Structures are given as C-alpha cells and as structure tokens.
UniProtKB/Swiss-Prot annotation:
Name of the protein in question: 2-hydroxyisobutanoyl-CoA mutase small subunit
Family designation: Belongs to the acyl-CoA mutase small subunit family.
Keywords on record: Cobalamin, Cobalt, Isomerase, Metal-binding
Job description of the protein: Together with HcmA, catalyzes the isomerization of 2-hydroxyisobutyryl-CoA and 3-hydroxybutyryl-CoA. Is specific for 2-hydroxyisobutyryl-CoA and (S)-3-hydroxybutyryl-CoA, and shows only very low activity with (R)-3-hydroxybutyryl-CoA, isobutyryl-CoA and butyryl-CoA. In vitro, can isomerize pivalyl-CoA and isovaleryl-CoA, with much lower efficiency. Plays a central role in the degradation of substrates bearing a tert-butyl moiety, such as the fuel oxygenate methyl tert-butyl ether (MTBE) and its metabolites.
Record-annotated B12-binding domain positions: 5-133
Quaternary structure annotation from Swiss-Prot or TrEMBL: Homotetramer composed of two large substrate-binding subunits (HcmA) and two small cobalamin-binding subunits (HcmB).
Cofactor entry: adenosylcob(III)alamin
An example Gene Ontology molecular-function term: cobalamin binding
Organism field: Aquincola tertiaricarbonis
UniProt EC number: 5.4.99.64
InterPro entries on file: Acid_CoA_mut_C, Cobalamin-bd, Cobalamin-bd_sf
Catalytic reactions of this protein: 2-hydroxyisobutanoyl-CoA = (3S)-3-hydroxybutanoyl-CoA
Annotated Gene3D superfamilies: Cobalamin-binding domain
Amino acid sequence: MDQTPIRVLLAKVGLDGHDRGVKVVARALRDAGMDVIYSGLHRTPEEVVNTAIQEDVDVLGVSLLSGVQLTVFPKIFKLLDERGAGDLIVIAGGVMPDEDAAAIRKLGVREVLLQDTPPQAIIDSIRSLVAARGAR
C-alpha cells in the first residue's frame, strides 16, 4: 500500500540568522521518509503561510532563536485563519522561556520542541500529530 509522505515546511522567521539546528532537523525528517521544504532565513509570517498553503504541507515548523515568538505566532495564526488554513498543524522549535512556550501553545501551537529535543522525538511527535489529525 502506497502512503503519501508527510509534508513539512520548516521556516525561519525574522532576523534570526542561525539555521544549523533546523538543517539538522530537516535532514532527520527526510531520513525518516518525510518531504521537507526549508524556507531559508529571514522569512516573514506572510511568506511562510503562503509557502505552507502553496506546498500543501501537513505541518508547519517554525524555528526561532531570536525571542520573537509572542509576535510571530499570533501573525501566523491570523494569516492561516484568513486563508482558510486554520487547521494546519503548527509546531515550534528553538529557544524560548517556558512561559512563552505555554503562551504560544494557547494560541494553537501543537508542540514546542526546544533545542535539546532529540531528532527522533521530533519525528515521533510529527507522526503522532499527523496521525491524530487523520491526514494523508
């Protein structure tokens, strides 16, 4: 039985110029059989949402190391809702205080995977979220 691979967009939003970690995650997800699109650095919320919709991804993963999560995620969710994609699974990665992680979960971020999360845990989390949604 053929199964369509899980499609994931990994995005770097804002001025953060560090992408080594997100590239490691991208490789791990690809090695696990997922289709991965990497946005590159310095993307806007609008670019990320547009790409997620155009590429028909199952999961949008936003990596942040710059402390802008409380600004970026409200914009992303507003744009997703406006474009009829409010059901997209959104996860966050990077570095952030526990209180920020809790705040973005309340906005709709399904999982917050910080810098010390092993790649296999990220893979398992994405598979579980997509399976629970019943995608593909």
